[in-house]
Amino acid sequence: MEVLAAETTSQQERLQAIAEKRKRQAEIENKRRQLEDERRQLQHLKSKALRERWLLEGTPSSASEGDEDLRRQMQDDEQKTRLLEDSVSRLEKEIEVLERGDSAPATAKENAAAPSPVRAPAPSPAKEERKTEVVMNSQQTPVGTPKDKRVSNTPLRTVDGSPMMKAAMYSVEITVEKDKVTGETRVLSSTTLLPRQPLPLGIKVYEDETKVVHAVDGTAENGIHPLSSSEVDELIHKADEVTLSEAGSTAGAAETRGAVEGAARTTPSRREITGVQAQPGEATSGPPGIQPGQEPPVTMIFMGYQNVEDEAETKKVLGLQDTITAELVVIEDAAEPKEPAPPNGSAAEPPTEAASREENQAGPEATTSDPQDLDMKKHRCKCCSIM
């Protein structure tokens, strides 16, 4: 019965210690959150006071009601700033005390709360002394604290307290500009890089289990200012927005460039061909597809048809009703055969040209032709009708 009562008491004390530890951790988290909020309010008040002081310096010496209200507001802001600074320092001290109490050594009751299913025999004096030494040694080492604390300035982290290191997956280089008047931080550019083993020379301003932030440039001008977790998250969010905006602008420029190139491809450009001289007789203004010297095509439109049986009606339809018909009879002499007049009424060719053409066509065989053919040529007469 005594063993069961002791085990029950030790179990209750252990549960009570665990509950107190959880309560202390929750209180630490609440105070940290309150500290972050007050730091943000303090920074806002400082930037506001700096802006109001700058506005007062630019106003003329003659005081007005607006300037008096502004000075009164500045005094109230300075008083709030002092109160916030005192509150921030107090919260920092309270958090430090709570963290120190959380890592304090456990009580002897917590260390001796391990249940023993088998009742051990009464220890001898030597064993009692040895047990006391073990308890003292365990009390000197806080429960839950690592025995070997590794401090590293690199993003390499230990895994479960083992000496195996976890390498960084990537690094982000963020260019930040801070307005000295308003205190606002603006991200200029964000570039994702491979992790560099010789780390850039800078000052570490933030570190947790997943991220390490180094201030590379501008530490001499702006001083060393450690960042909080909320500030780091806000900085990463702004960097992501800048990266997305740059990607969107690049895609829009590529689409515009592709549209311009497609329009230039589809629209044929007019080119001037040098080194070609137009001939006087060439037709330069004709329709496309017609070579020089060719007649342009004629467009014919079918207007209908009409059946005509009478010849007079036919002439009337064709417009030949009042035309004059003439017949020309040419009688050739037997000594000098002449060519008849052309049927279309044009001028006859000179006799020399006609004779030479007949000689060229007939050749030497013309002199030895049969007399029957010559008689046929003499007695043949031709007539034509001129309309």
Swiss-Prot record:
Keyword Lipoprotein included in the entry's annotation: yes
Keywords tagged on the record: Acetylation, Cell membrane, Cell projection, Cell shape, Coiled coil, Lipoprotein, Membrane, Methylation, Palmitate, Phosphoprotein, Prenylation, Synapse
Protein topology in the membrane: Lipid-anchor
Record-level GO cellular component terms: apicolateral plasma membrane; axon; basolateral plasma membrane; cytoplasmic side of plasma membrane; cytoplasmic vesicle; dendritic spine; filopodium; filopodium membrane
Primary localisation category: membrane
Modified residues (N-acetylmethionine): M1
Propeptide, residue positions: 385-387
Record note on quaternary structure: Interacts with dopamine receptor DRD3.
Protein name: Paralemmin-1
Organism of provenance: Homo sapiens (Human)
